[in-house]
């Protein structure tokens, strides 16, 4: 009984307007950031290295190189602070989790584009 109530409440919270993306894709994520009284959008662009599908608890990890340092950020897929996700390019990979990219540098970390 209580399980059905939880599912009903969670289904109301799910976002419906999310694009289809996979690990290996380059995405630009717009996040609402609150600084004091102001609120602005912050863009984070990088490669999706992991995706976790758990209904309302779904998340994905995006990795980018900023000033020579690798930066990874985990986003909750259905979070209200997540404004939009824009898929810039599709990557052709054969793994679900691309954690091996953490050790790769330069051209070795490139991902082929899906045609």
From Swiss-Prot:
Biological role: This protein is located at the 30S-50S ribosomal subunit interface and may play a role in the structure and function of the aminoacyl-tRNA binding site.
Organism this protein belongs to: Nitrosococcus oceani (strain ATCC 19707 / BCRC 17464 / JCM 30415 / NCIMB 11848 / C-107)
PANTHER family: LARGE RIBOSOMAL SUBUNIT PROTEIN BL19M, RIBOSOMAL PROTEIN L19
Any one Gene Ontology molecular-function term assigned to this protein's record: structural constituent of ribosome
GO CC annotations on file: cytosolic large ribosomal subunit
Membrane-crossing segments per the record: none
Record keywords, A-Z: Ribonucleoprotein, Ribosomal protein
This protein's encoding gene: rplS
Protein name: Large ribosomal subunit protein bL19
InterPro entries for the chain: Ribosomal_bL19, Ribosomal_bL19_CS, Ribosomal_bL19_sf, Translation_prot_SH3-like_sf
